[in-house]
Amino acid sequence: MVQETNGRKTGLLASLDWWTIAIYVALLIFGWVSVCGASYTFGDTDIFSLSTRSGMQIVWMATSIILGFVILMLDDRFYDTFSYVIYGVLLLLLFATIFNPHEIKGSRSWLVLGPIHVQPAEFAKFATALAVAKFMSTYGFDMQNWKHFAAALSIVVLPMLFIVAQKETGSALVYLSFFLMFYREGMPGGILFTGVAMILYFVIGIKYEQVLLWDTPTSLGKFAVLLMVQIFSAGMVYDYCKDKAKALQIASVSIGITLVFLLFSKFVIPFDIVWIQIGISILLIGYLLYHSLYTRMRNYFYILIFAIGSIAFFYSADFVLNNVMEPHQRVRINVLLGLDEDLAGAGYNVHQSEIAIGSGGLKGKGFLNGTQTKLKFVPEQDTDFIFCTVGEEEGFVGAAGVLLLFLALILRLIKLAERQPFSFGRIYGYCVLSIFLFHVFINVGMVLGLTPVIGIPLPFFSYGGSSLWGFTILLFIFLRIDASRNFTN
């Protein structure tokens, strides 16, 4: 028995994916260098002092490495067996945090234990990934069964709701990344497409709502969205119902009638042709309803729901923006869409981070030589906006190098996930890479002014123990599961 255990441990070391560990260590080192650059001031004499953020980050790094080692030493079956227990404990912590009297920067997402501040939302990600992987890997689970899918989705949505109640909408949005895993496991592509379509409706509808189309009293935003709904519906008829004739009929009639009335509005009597489009949409809905009842094909009914939902979502978008979202979130979206500039207010962070990145040039200003960061022009420059420090001190070369490291990590995780012998490991692996991909894409995007500022950290770079520990646990559990593939009967 002892010999078998020793052989298993020796085999474990050989089975570990050392390439991923090497990327992890490289990201830790570059992250610490960035924290040094972001938190360093001209009066600092020792970047290793525990009184500085760079010094404390070394502590978080050391404890993270120890934590990773402990995770690797545990039996891989532990994570499968106790996944629901871990998930339940984290849900309780998230629920308790809602009633936390201590607010930090307007958020109740922190548990304050004396000098220690812990953010359960950072740890809930790996717990949710374990729970949903456990549920979806059970015998008989079928992604095409709506009850099964709804149950799996509820595992993801529940922590989202608790985190939103903590006034941490940005952290809650990270859970949308699980839809990439759902798609890999067989979720209908129409669901993913619907999500993308809703984003397009919101962005185009809000951004161009006040812009007139071709000097007619027609909102370009409303015109574009309603036309997209009709074209998307025609495309879905072609793809899901395999009826090319009906798809061409819907598209040609919708576009043809719209074009005729647009020309009439332009050259004869100006009027808002959105009303014509609404009429066309009503006819489209009736047409789809008739065929869903006549042919008994569910796909026609699903397309009908898509068309109705699209129109309802679009006309509720303005209400959500002005009545549901917090004022600071509304201002951020308006700034992102170019509706407001506000360089001294909501757009200040992004504007200053763009200046910092642009000033770095090709090769950067050098380690600890960034002026925008040293003079504290960029708020949150060592947490959410730490990527601007990379761009300023290391330049385009350094920023590109960091992004290539993250790309290498994502590609490596895809390879590891696909080689798992059981669905539990594959599903958890795709949860891990989806979370990393979302964090990197959104964080870098918001620093560059390409995505809304939602306040999520850059993995292994942003200062803080909760973030670093959370990402380390998330990654090393997967490495432990992957390493056991050669010992599974």
Question: Model-predicted segments: where are they?
Answer:
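Glycine/serine-rich anion-binding loops at beta->alpha junctions
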Residues: 115-124, 166-167, 361, 453-472
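Long extracytoplasmic/lumenal interhelical loops at the membrane interface
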Residues: 354-357, 361-394
